[in-house]
Amino acid sequence: MLAFLGSLLAFVLASRIIPVIIYTVRVKNLMDEPGDRSAHSDKTPTLGGVGMFAAFVVSLILFGIVVGLERPDLVKLLSLTLSTIILMFLGIKDDLIALAARKKFLGQLISTAIVIFLTDVRITSFEGLLGVGELPYLVSVLFTIFVFILVINAFNLIDGIDGLAGAIGIISSLSFGLFFLLNKDYLMVLVSFSLIGAISAFLRYNLSGTRKLFMGDSGSMVIGYLLAYQGIRFLELNLSGSSLFTINNGPVLLLAILSFPLLDTLRVFIIRAKERRSPFDADCNHIHHRLLILGFSHKQATIMLSIVSVLAIELAYLLKDLEINLQLFTVTLIIPLIYYLLFNSTRIRENAIKLNEVRAVKDKRSAVDLGFKKYVPSLIVRKTFVEESGHSQKAVVNGANRREKAELSEKRIKELEKSKMHLVVSKKIKKKNKSSKLK
């Protein structure tokens, strides 16, 4: 009941707050401008994370008081609230005026240090994974900081298409929340389900056609932080002898729950390293960008990646009785293989082309954007963005008549050049005739 009420209150509050944010952002013209890497073509309100955060915090504090949390849990609640406030304002500033990477890193470091040193929330053991057991205190603190910052930024990186960050956030938080519910950890139940309620309300607008809103860094960094916090609490509660429900493969299950953002981050970092670029350079090599290039819409890509995430969690849970290192090997082998098959399946590519053609027929603006509607009325096109040579982006046209488009466009250019030359020549002749008559 507590989980349901906390989630419901956060949902209702966020549903009330977000329309006010949309109105304010439009009036103040604080819109997200489409750029080379953008998967959207129109100005869109951002700062959706502010509405989610406000609803989450109010729900968390209110039910924390109602439940009557003990002093240690109240300290955890207040430290968690303080650290997320820092991240939210950091995200707002980055949404409005882009922050330098070092300033964002410093803010993330401070937020992480608050919960580690005030509440001693840290990873204390690998539970035998890779032959590592209990960690020394300093190693434990440093590794926990690394995990927090990794998950925050990994989650920030997947916030590239409509619904994706929110959907993965709900799946991950629900996975942790069910574990906390079985163990009657009421503070963490509130954290998990209040976050689910706030994200669910945001998705109503993020997936809307007329009242669209982006969460921005103010949302993605806070969600990533809260998921990292839940993940570490999950590991520590699973290790404690007082747990009512335990899982003997905690670290592997945690990796599976966060597999999509972590795998996507690792993938783009490897690609950038191969191209001798900074791992923090922005590009369009993310998994969700690849699905858009295949022809899937934002919603279709989000649904596909969400299904894969659920399958990864289910796989890790089913393998729980195996030796932990064998589990790790199996999970790290099968999950990337699923994504590889997703990109290279001929059937998926064919279906993507069909879906792309149907959608392009319904949306004639794609043809207008590329400037071929007047000259190539039968052409079915859709504009997406892809990185070329790791540095520049170009519009990629998917459709049945690519050659026809290229030939006709070249022909049209030549015709225009010829007509322009004829016009210049005729003007010169007329000018010459006039001058001869005057003489």
State where each predicted segment sits.
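Short aromatic-rich membrane-water interface segments that cap or initiate transmembrane helices
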Residues: 42-45, 131-141, 247-254
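Hydrophobic alpha-helical hairpins/lids featuring a short glycine-rich hinge
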Residues: 78-110, 115
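Membrane interface segments of multi-pass transport proteins and intramembrane proteases
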Residues: 95, 100, 126-135, 296
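Long, low-complexity, intrinsically disordered cytosolic termini of multi-pass membrane proteins
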Residues: 352-439
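Juxtamembrane helix-capping/reentrant segments at transmembrane boundaries
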Residues: 33-47
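Alpha-helical transmembrane segments
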Residues: 1-29, 53-89, 165-294, 298-373, ...
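Function-critical hydrophobic alpha-helical transmembrane segments in multi-pass membrane proteins
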Residues: 144-155, 164-165
